[in-house]
Amino acid sequence: MAREFSRTNRVGQQIQREIALILQREVKDPRIGMVTVSDVEVSKDLNYAKVYVTFLQLDIDAERIAEGLKGLTEAAGYIRSLLGSAMRLRVVPELRFYYDQTLVEGMRISNLVSNTVRDDKRRMAEAGREEDEAAPDDTTEDKA
């Protein structure tokens, strides 16, 4: 039976922290810019690590994402060597970088929900005004 927190999960969390520090302090590639390491998945044999990253530029497009991932991929050997000196592992995993879409998708869904709520409130207000306009006419007819 697998434990709730297996060794691969613990190693993945530690690798995530170390890579975040390395990217913040050591890697000076302008293509990368401000990057956040959102998750790391390590293979069971600890030979490979999928590193999920998010770029923090406001005007990010597919071209800049590809450029940032290319910069990270080219710096993967350097990051791996720094990771090896920071952690005690028999084999330091080969790093593979992927763009994490969850933040972008979360913001898109949040905007959709906000727009829907705003539209519903507007429709309710318009429907309320129509009822209010119809109601005074009905009361004047009753008095006459």
UniProtKB/Swiss-Prot annotation:
The keyword Heme does not apply. One of its GO terms (biological process) is maturation of SSU-rRNA. NCBIfam families: rbfA. This is Ribosome-binding factor A. GO terms for molecular function: ribosomal small subunit binding. Monomer. Binds 30S ribosomal subunits, but not 50S ribosomal subunits or 70S ribosomes. Its main location: cytoplasm. It is found in: Cytoplasm. InterPro entries: KH_dom-like_a/b, RbfA, RbfA_dom_sf, Ribosome-bd_factorA_CS. Keywords: Cytoplasm, Ribosome biogenesis. It holds the Pfam family RBFA. It comes from Aeromonas salmonicida (strain A449). One of its GO terms (cellular component) is cytosol. Belongs to the RbfA family. HAMAP family: RbfA (MF_00003). One of several proteins that assist in the late maturation steps of the functional core of the 30S ribosomal subunit. Associates with free 30S ribosomal subunits (but not with 30S subunits that are part of 70S ribosomes or polysomes). Required for efficient processing of 16S rRNA. May interact with the 5'-terminal helix region of 16S rRNA. Residues 120-144 are annotated as: Disordered. Residues 129-144 have a biased composition (Acidic residues).
